[in-house]
Amino acid sequence: RCKNNLRQIGIAIHNLNTSTGFFVDGGKDWWSARSMQGSTPRMAPHQNWGWLYQILPAMEVNNLYHFQPDYKIRRTPVEGYFCPSRRPPSVLGGLRAVNDYAGNGGVCGQGGGLSDWGEGKSGVIVRGGYTPKVTFETVTDGSTHTILVGEKALHPDHYNLFSISDNEGYTSGWD
């Protein structure tokens, strides 16, 4: 089922790329409210929330994408964002629904993590608000040789804890 979830996520991202001409992004930051234009959520590069939020309509979770208020969206887990062999859909501390998948944000420095200020801009799903839109043309190694999304690295002892690499929830787009 994990492979199927990754396949569905990949198809959702590609479908959005086909309709917009660019890839979803990693969102701007974890503390910002969702970007709206009237009552409609905005898309990358104008959406503060991350790629897993941005693909909800293509994952057939359109009702959650348009739901109000924001805090209820943050607390609602999406079944397709969890690998069943890892853990069930989870909400950490009753605050944020987490996920088991990570987007390719690019290379990172010796510390191993991407800064929330836009470093590591060489990936496909980069931080929003800091870099230009990523298109198939800007993927210099070619899309067949580039990882888009994968299972995120997380120690099993941290699956249901506030681990630094698993504490922001799927709406932030970078954890």
Regions found by a protein language model. Give the residues of each.
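Internal low-complexity, small-residue/proline-rich segments
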Residues: 1-175
